[in-house]
């Protein structure tokens, strides 16, 4: 078991402890560290020496910048601290009332492409023999991005193609429809990009960190939990600003110029606050009951709970 995953196993089994950890790990200043510093921090927490308070910075650097499954340094733009600075503006832009279909599809394409790349980088690759991306996986990602881009632009497509001019119907397309659509597309994005894990399975470990074998049940559970957490992130980000506008409707009727800035700021604020919450819903060191895995793995497992790298 990798040192990062072992760290999550020992300290991240409660929601509040994970939330406190993620608040520290999402610090953008961690992006300034070099690969050598990251590898040094990872080797430090993997040593047999007991860590003290002075090593907290090394723990945060390792958990935020190296892969919990392999220990490899994550690409700069796909590290958790970079998620808000990069995807935040894309989320705000994708939820804007667009003037045409092309603008809506452009921002959806950027957002869905980044989310697909983020999910792929943070996948569980324990059963992959080749380090290069396969043609099947590449085609799956291209198809996922294409489909979610078109589906994400559906509200604007309805408005333009059906020539919707009625204010209630425009409100339905621009304020109500994006809520379930954002959650569903975020769920679908993770589910399809990481579909291979459900077919080939992922490595599971016993309570002592020893490898037990490869489990498809654990792979399905890992992908499902990650997809659900991403749906919560984007669904909440879409619904809260709309509720805010609804509650302050009378205020915005008197101050119409303030509605757009308040909406954009609330989207960015809710998205930023929900990132550590969604990342904390399930531990990166996922658990599964021994009875839930394949029969051939149950005999060689010690303890009632098995662990695996869930991904992000």
Model-predicted regions and their roles:
Residues 1-96, 101-104, 269, 273, ...:
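Intrinsically disordered, low-complexity N-proximal targeting/linker segments that flank membranes
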Residues 140-211:
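Eukaryotic endomembrane system proteins
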Residues 99-163:
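Long, hydrophobic, well-ordered secondary-structure blocks that form the structural core
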Residues 189-287:
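Long, repeat-rich segments with strong aromatic
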Residues 88-96, 153-164, 241-255:
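Juxtamembrane "helix exit" motif at the C-terminal ends of alpha-helical transmembrane segments
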């Amino acid at each position: 078991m990798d040192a990062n995953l072992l760290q999550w196993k020992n300290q991240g089994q409660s929601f509040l402890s994970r939330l406190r950890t993620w608040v520290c790990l999402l610090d953008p200043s961690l992006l300034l560290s070099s690969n050598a510093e990251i590898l040094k921090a990872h080797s430090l927490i993997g040593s047999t020496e007991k860590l003290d308070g002075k090593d907290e910075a090394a723990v945060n650097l390792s958990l935020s910048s190296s892969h919990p499954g392999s220990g490899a340094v994550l690409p700069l733009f796909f590290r958790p601290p970079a998620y808000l600075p990069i995807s935040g503006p894309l989320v705000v832009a994708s939820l804007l009332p667009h003037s045409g279909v092309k603008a809506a599809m452009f921002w959806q394409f950027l957002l869905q492409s980044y989310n697909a790349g983020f999910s792929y980088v943070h996948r569980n690759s324990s059963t992959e023999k080749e380090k290069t991306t396969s043609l099947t996986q590449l085609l799956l990602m291209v198809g996922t991005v294409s489909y979610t881009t078109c589906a994400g632009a559906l509200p604007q497509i309805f408005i333009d193609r059906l020539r919707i001019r009625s204010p209630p119907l425009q409100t339905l397309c621009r304020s109500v429809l994006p809520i379930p659509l954002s959650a569903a597309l975020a769920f679908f994005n993770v589910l399809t990009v990481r579909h291979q894990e459900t077919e080939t399975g992922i490595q599971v470990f016993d309570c002592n960190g020893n490898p037990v074998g490869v489990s498809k049940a654990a792979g399905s559970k890992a992908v499902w939990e990650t997809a659900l957490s991403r749906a919560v992130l984007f669904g909440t980000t879409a619904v809260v600003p709309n509720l805010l506008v609804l509650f302050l409707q009378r205020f915005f009727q008197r101050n119409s110029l303030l509605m757009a800035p308040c909406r954009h700021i609330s989207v960015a604020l809710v998205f930023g606050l929900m990132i550590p919450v969604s990342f904390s819903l399930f531990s990166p060191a996922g658990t599964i009951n021994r009875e839930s895995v394949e029969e051939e793995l149950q005999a060689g497992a010690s303890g009632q709970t098995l662990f695996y790298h869930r991904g992000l």
